[in-house]
Amino acid sequence: MLSLKLLRENPEFVIAKLAVKNFDAREIVEKINVLDQNRRALQTELDACLAEQKKKAAQIGGLMKEGKREEADAVKAEVAALKTRSGEIEKTSEENNSELNSLLVLLPNLPCDQVPEGKTAEDNVVVKMGNEIPELGENNLPHWDLAKKYDIIDFDLGVKLTGAGFPVYKGKGARLQRALINYFLDQNTSVGYLEVEPPVMVNEASGFGTGQLPDKEGQMYHATVDNFYLVPTAEVPVTNIYRDVILGNNDFPVKMTAYTPCFRREAGSYGKDVRGLNRLHQFDKVEIVRIEKPEESYAALDEMIAHVEKLVASLGLPYRILRLCGGDMSFTSAITYDFEVYSAAQGRWLEISSVSNFESYQANRLKLRYKDADGKVQLAHTLNGSSLALPRVVAALLENNQKADRIEIPEVLRPYTGFDYID
């Protein structure tokens, strides 16, 4: 959430920055500043009213002791009137602030200066590529046909049990899933990330804190009876561990990793982009989350990008790293780098990770702060990234490593799978 101070002092800067995200903020910013002016004026009036009320109330006892009942009664009447007025101001202030807050949450985070301009994914900038694209033999198959051929993923059974987008992994397919999760977690913990196992349902405050609510409410599964939400990513519960926390100056860096199943409605998805594992309603993902001092968050972002790149490269998958343009960025991000792997049988790039710096945007919503070296309370910066999302990794592994009679497993995974190939 953007700060009122920033909106009040630099409204044109905010409007120009959000235009990079193709977001027209002028009307909202102008309304916010009017409401903010009202908020401050009402608070000043309320403070004066309460101070006068306290001053008058203190006079009553002395007047009564002096036997000045009529004067005391007159002051009591004044106090009662001031009390009524303060109540009216408080009610007006609550209504004003409610409208103010409802508008504040509609503003996305500002993109940082490194974000390129652009409207769609076509405008994203490729900053690096690695590993060669394999040349497959004749009669190569997409992963959904390979899954059926080797009986490792059953999409039809998932439809029977739940619906489309909920596959059932079987045999070596299930073991490959488990191997990838354990490999990713081990690689993350080896560089200092603390493993946590969070709930996969969160309350509304958690969804609001990381910015999924209200922006992505329509894409989240909502258990309405208890008002809980299934997590779309481990980012939500893990980052919220530090909601309403004030860290010490020496508590940094905070580095956490978690595996969770993730749940997304993905309403409106259709066509080739959703075949097989390309887009699911339930999928497995390992996440890394960091909390940093503002002056150290971009160095942390570079570390996270390098770590995710090392993970992807170790699997032998052809990959590319993209810096997202303003129009393709998420609501909460200040900058995002996407990792994509090449799916040889489909002949297309598949996103497997996003690594983002949110600067203080989430921290402001979370009330996640720290005391600096001078003891001053400041907002922290939050970052997260997928390390990695499994479905498209599996799709690319199956397709790129297929032979006529088997699918070879990358060497780094063999200690985890217990087998060298799927046949």
Regions found by a protein language model. Give the residues of each.
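N-terminal alpha-helical targeting/anchoring segments
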Residues: 1-134, 152, 156
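TRNA-recognition modules of translation machinery and tRNA-sensing kinases, especially anticodon-binding
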Residues: 26, 129-423
